[in-house]
Amino acid sequence: MISLLKAREKLLSPLVSSTIRRLSSSLSYSREDSRDSEVLIHPSAVVHPNAVIGKGVSVGPYCTIGSSVKLGNGCKLYPSSHVFGNTELGESCVLMTGAVVGDELPGYTFIGCNNIIGHHAVVGVKCQDLKYKHGDECFLCIGNNNEIREFCSIHRSSKPSDKTVIGDNNLIMGSCHIAHDCKIGDRNIFANNTLLAGHVVVEDNTHTAGASVVHQFCHIGSFAFIGGGSVVSQDVPKYMMVAGERAELRGLNLEGLRRNGFTMSEMKSLRAAYRKIFMSTETVSLSFEERLTELEQDQELYSVPAVSAMLQSIRDSFTESRRGICKFRQWLDSTT
């Protein structure tokens, strides 16, 4: 009998050990899940009881969270950051010290997931347009994975029928300003002190150097580059580079195109098209419209998607309500 009991104990021992390990592991995961979902609010923070706080949110000292605020799972508010008004932050957003998001205004501020709002940045507040009517709804929508650095200011729209919109994966460096009703695409880099006036449209993959200024209603095409200290008062077509106190076209943004995966063949075609439009060597001088038409009739070049996109970007700039394109340096004494 004793030998039988010993044999049974020997047989069951691995099963018991395995069960204990599974239970221990389960309890460990349970404790980790509990820690991950725990909401940490510093005693000095002011959080309205009607605010919706997700799992794992951390609210630091002296923060303020208003009554209509929604914070997604995993958001972190560093000391003295504040969220006001009808404002929603997606998962894993970070507000650095002194950041202010939202305003007690009709409308809303919506910010997606994984965004960083830098020290003392002000995002989603009333615009500085005097045409804004008190009591009107105004809106700001920001996508995912944006880094908005210290002292930036981003304003809501100036009217209920419009929105200020920022896409995904943008880097907005320190002290930049994005005014009311701007439309910003994806993967743009705005260097320090870039200033965008109201209603500016910036497409995708653009790069502005420091202290660039863009006039209201201008349109910046994809893969464009704006040189440091430039004042842009007209549109910048796709793929082009501008610079100057009154920004002028300085050629194609070839380095930016190369970094973004454009082939040598595509860049060669773009250079040929650019020369036809802006650096024509024809003995008989053609008007700007005639040069565009001539390029459209060049089947070899126009069949390249990048070339046709560049040409369409130029043509769009001359439609009603648009400002035309920045002048080419050799145009300064010309009516074209």
From Swiss-Prot:
Positions annotated to bind substrate: 128-131, 180, 199, 216
Catalytic reaction list: a (3R)-hydroxyacyl-[ACP] + UDP-N-acetyl-alpha-D-glucosamine = a UDP-3-O-[(3R)-3-hydroxyacyl]-N-acetyl-alpha-D-glucosamine + holo-[ACP]
Keyword DNA repair found: no
One Pfam family from the record: Acetyltransf_11
Transit peptide (residue range): 1-32
EC number: 2.3.1.129
GO cellular component: membrane; mitochondrion
Pathway: Glycolipid biosynthesis; lipid IV(A) biosynthesis; lipid IV(A) from (3R)-3-hydroxytetradecanoyl-[acyl-carrier-protein] and UDP-N-acetyl-alpha-D-glucosamine: step 1/6
A GO molecular-function annotation: acyl-[acyl-carrier-protein]-UDP-N-acetylglucosamine O-acyltransferase activity
Disruption phenotype: No visible phenotype under normal growth conditions, but plants lacking LPXA accumulate very low levels of 2,3-diacylglucosamine-1-phosphate.
Keyword Cell cycle: no
Top enzyme class: transferase
UniProt subunit comment: Homotrimer.
Function: Involved in the biosynthesis of lipid A, a phosphorylated glycolipid that in bacteria anchors the lipopolysaccharide to the outer membrane of the cell. Lipid A-like molecules in plants may serve as structural components of the outer membranes of mitochondria and/or chloroplasts, or may be involved in signal transduction or plant defense responses (Potential).
NCBIfam families, A to Z: PRK05289.1 (NF003657)
PANTHER family tied to this protein: ACYL-[ACYL-CARRIER-PROTEIN]--UDP-N-ACETYLGLUCOSAMINE O-ACYLTRANSFERASE, ACYL-[ACYL-CARRIER-PROTEIN]--UDP-N-ACETYLGLUCOSAMINE O-ACYLTRANSFERASE, MITOCHONDRIAL-RELATED
Family: Belongs to the transferase hexapeptide repeat family. LpxA subfamily.
Protein name per its UniProtKB record: Probable acyl-[acyl-carrier-protein]--UDP-N-acetylglucosamine O-acyltransferase, mitochondrial
Source organism of this protein record: Arabidopsis thaliana (Mouse-ear cress)
